[in-house]
């Protein structure tokens, strides 16, 4: 794929089986200032995909993006640190309020990673943010595991149904 809007690129990554697109996406995202904390233990975590969706796609697009970012920033990536405590329906057609309810308590830190997360600056990676409900639910789990701080990076921003254009 050459050119294309951010939305087209994300759609190709997620739904057309083009994980290699994570490379140029990570190149763009890696230029962001202020994400890494100098002197802190920085680590990247990806938003876990529902098992059925990952089986269907063959990969987790957020994990692929996180791995590419980790290589550029030269920090650890813990793509299996966060897990879904339950499967959640797709959020594409949900309102902001429905999204909050949909992902509430849907994530936790895998026990093997809790000690590593304690006191660390964790950077959550996802392909797109819409309302922030998923990011907030993941951050809640990361703070519960003892993270010192949590930041997030995404490649794109989407509008939720009913959002006014900006």
Identify what each model region corresponds to.
Residues 1-72, 92:
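Extended interfacial segments that mediate partner engagement and assembly in macromolecular machines
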Residues 67, 71, 76, 80-166:
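PRPP/pyrophosphate-binding module of the type I phosphoribosyltransferase fold
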């Amino acid at each position: 794929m050459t050119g294309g809007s951010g939305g087209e690129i994300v759609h190709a990554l997620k739904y057309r089986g083009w994980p290699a697109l994570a490379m140029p996406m990570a190149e763009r995202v890696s230029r962001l200032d202020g994400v890494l904390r100098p002197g802190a233990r920085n680590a990247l975590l990806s938003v876990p995909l529902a098992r059925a969706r990952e089986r269907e796609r063959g990969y987790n697009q957020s994990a692929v993006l996180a791995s590419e970012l980790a290589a550029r920033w030269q920090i650890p990536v813990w793509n299996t640190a966060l897990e879904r405590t339950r499967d959640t329906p797709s959020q594409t057609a949900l309102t902001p309020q429905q999204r909050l309810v949909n992902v509430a308590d849907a994530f936790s830190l895998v026990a093997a990673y809790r000690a590593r997360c304690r006191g660390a600056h964790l950077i959550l990676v996802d392909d797109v943010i819409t309302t922030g409900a998923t990011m907030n639910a993941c951050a809640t789990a990361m703070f519960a595991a003892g993270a010192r701080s949590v930041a997030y990076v995404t490649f794109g921003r989407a509008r939720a149904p009913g959002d006014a254009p900006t």
